[in-house]
């Protein structure tokens, strides 16, 4: 009987903690889209100053524009 109560209490605590932390995720996703907008207006000097993670993001963005799947979303 105690083990069932403990399991129920554990599940409720996980659900409550998940509910209270979901507000943090949409802001982090918005930052990713802002980064894509920042990559739109690059010139050569900006390209030389990029961090490696920015270059990966730029490469992913270029591949997305070249892919056939992207044309389906237009």
Curated annotation (Swiss-Prot):
Signal peptide: 1-24
Organismal lineage: Eukaryota, Metazoa, Ecdysozoa, Arthropoda, Chelicerata
Subcellular location: Secreted
Keyword DNA-binding found: no
Tissue specificity as recorded in UniProt: Expressed by the venom gland.
Role played: May be an antimicrobial peptide.
Name recorded for this polypeptide: Anionic peptide clone 7
Family: Belongs to the non-disulfide-bridged peptide (NDBP) superfamily. Long chain multifunctional peptide (group 2) family.
């Amino acid at each position: 009987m105690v083990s069932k109560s403990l399991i129920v209490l554990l599940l409720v605590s996980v659900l409550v903690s998940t509910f209270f932390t979901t507000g943090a995720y949409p802001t982090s996703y918005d930052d990713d889209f802002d980064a894509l907008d920042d990559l739109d207006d690059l010139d050569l000097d900006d390209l030389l100053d990029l961090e490696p993670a920015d270059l990966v993001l730029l490469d992913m963005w270029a591949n997305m524009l070249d892919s056939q799947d992207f044309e389906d979303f237009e």
